[in-house]
Structures are given as structure tokens and as C-alpha cells.
Amino acid sequence: MEKFIELSLKEVTAITGGKYYGNGVHCGKHSCTVDWGTAIGNIGNNAAANWATGGNAGWNK
């Protein structure tokens, strides 16, 4: 079992982090990185969705 400590609002706001886009891309203050294992899976899923819908997948309407 892991131990956790509760952070105060002041401590939480002092944390600097980046943004995760949900597709394997994570960007910090000065750079971005790609988790290719996740990204390739998303590329495959998007390709299959576009093929199955004739290019009319949800984000291409």
C-alpha cells in the first residue's frame, strides 16, 4: 500500500507541470515528448475509424 500526504492549496499551486493531450503527447514549459506506444495505437484507431466511415469520423465532419 502506498502512503500519501495531503497538500495544502499553496503547495498544490506551487507545482509546475505540463499538459497531457490524451494521445501520447505531453508538453511541458519548454518542450513536448511523445509516448510512441500510445500514439501509434491512436493513429491506428483513427485510421480504422476514417476507413470505416469513408473519412467522416467524428472529428472530420
Swiss-Prot record:
One of its GO terms (biological process) is defense response to bacterium. InterPro entries: Bacteriocin_IIa (IPR002633), Bacteriocin_IIa_CS (IPR023384), Bacteriocin_IIa_dom_sf (IPR023388). Disulfide bonds join C27-C32. It comes from Latilactobacillus sakei. This is Bacteriocin sakacin-P. PROSITE patterns: BACTERIOCIN_IIA (PS60030). Belongs to the bacteriocin class IIA/YGNGV family. One of its GO terms (cellular component) is extracellular region. It is found in: Secreted. Keywords: Antibiotic, Antimicrobial, Bacteriocin, Disulfide bond, Secreted. Bactericidal activity; inhibits closely related Lactobacilli, Listeria monocytogenes and ivanovvi, Enterococcus faecalis, Carnobacterium sp and Brocothrix thermosphacta. Residues 1-18 form a propeptide.
